[in-house]
A protein has these predicted regions:
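An N-terminal hydrophobic leader/cap segment in hydrolases
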Residues: 1-40, 44-51
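Active-site glycine-rich loops that stabilize anionic/oxyanionic intermediates
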Residues: 65-68, 136, 261
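Catalytic nucleophile-loop/oxyanion-hole region of alpha/beta-hydrolase
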Residues: 67-69, 96-127
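Conserved alpha/beta-hydrolase
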Residues: 70, 77-100
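Alpha/beta-hydrolase-fold enzymes
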Residues: 137-230
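Short beta-strand/loop motif that positions the catalytic acidic residue
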Residues: 251, 257-259, 263
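Short alpha-helix in the alpha/beta-hydrolase fold that links the catalytic acid
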Residues: 253, 267-276
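Catalytic histidine-centered segment of alpha/beta-hydrolase-like enzymes
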Residues: 290-294
């Protein structure tokens, strides 16, 4: 018997609890929830949320961050849809509903490859240019992905978490024992530690994800988001990622940084240092009164 696939509509309704925190016009309901799709590639069953807009001149690939998933961002995607834009939001494994086949290793390179493949697939459908929009660490994923795809015509990021900068690694970790000693151990003993799984709450300052304690608690307890246990291989490869194209040499497309003003997890100065090095057309907008998620 064929295995039935999980669904946010029928089997995993936790996301419905988030809706009360959003303005009524972008809340998800029976007639406004994203279309759910599945795609099997690279040893991954990839879950994708789609908010269609047939007349949209572009497609927006919305990339979640650590401790998130595509459905968590869907009210923001709904806002974009209401303005005429089609949005595609994949769940990057092991977050959300996506899952890997036996023997598939979950690491940062896999995430980038999946995103590039989604871009190629979407472009082949109708030739519409792609804009990548990344939230939290998804901002840097948007940058890495755009550096590999000629179809990306714009990058929008809420932060640039460049983990090649040791000060950035110290900033996002709960303490320097994790950011320095922990990283050193993962680098020395990948064969022993790569398959160990921990919650992102244990290796980051996830308690700073929003400026609303109730919403933060909801995200922290979400079994498809911050409560998901990730393999240390994903963390190790994320922390060791160097930009394949340095920002001074990046020529792919314009960049828009929309940075939360009240973001204690990744203060603006860290994103600004990367943003200032970009040689392309760029703009920075500060989201007044906002934290990293809301």
């Amino acid at each position: 018997m064929k295995k039935s696939l999980p669904s946010y509509q029928t089997t995993h309704p936790y996301w419905k609890q988030y809706q009360a925190f959003f303005p009524e016009e972008v809340r998800l309901g029976e007639h406004t929830a994203p279309q759910e799709e599945w795609w099997e590639l690279n040893g991954v069953h990839l879950h994708i949320d789609r908010l269609p807009a047939p007349e949209s001149p572009i497609k927006i690939l919305f990339i979640h961050g650590a401790g998130g998933n595509g459905r968590l961002l869907a009210p923001y995607a709904r806002m974009l849809q209401r303005h005429g834009y089609e949005v595609v939001s994949p769940d990057l494994p092991p977050y959300g509903l996506s899952y890997v086949m036996s023997g598939t290793r979950i690491n940062y390179e896999l995430w980038i490859e999946l995103l590039v493949s989604v871009i190629e697939r979407e472009y082949k459908k109708d030739g519409k240019p792609i804009v990548v929009l990344g939230s939290s660490i998804g901002g840097m994923l948007a940058y890495h992905t755009s550096a590999r795809s000629k179809h990306v015509k714009g990058v929008i990021a809420t932060t640039f978490v460049d983990t090649s900068n040791p000060e950035m690694r110290d900033q996002i970790a709960p303490n320097r024992l994790v950011s320095r000693v922990g990283k050193r151990m993962m680098d020395l003993f990948p064969g022993l530690l790569d398959h160990v799984r921990l919650s992102v709450k244990q290796v980051s300052r996830m308690q700073l994800i929003t400026n609303n304690q109730d919403l933060t608690r909801l995200i922290m307890n979400d079994p498809q988001a911050a409560a998901t246990r990730i393999p240390l291989e994903l963390l190790r490869t994320f922390l060791n990622k160097e930009p394949e194209v340095q920002p001074e040499q990046f020529t792919q497309c314009p960049v828009l940084l929309v940075h939360p003003e009240l973001d204690p997890m990744t203060p603006i100065r860290f994103s600004q240092s990367f943003f200032d090095r970009l040689a392309v057309d760029k703009e920075c907008i500060i989201l007044e009164g906002q934290a990293i998620f809301r």
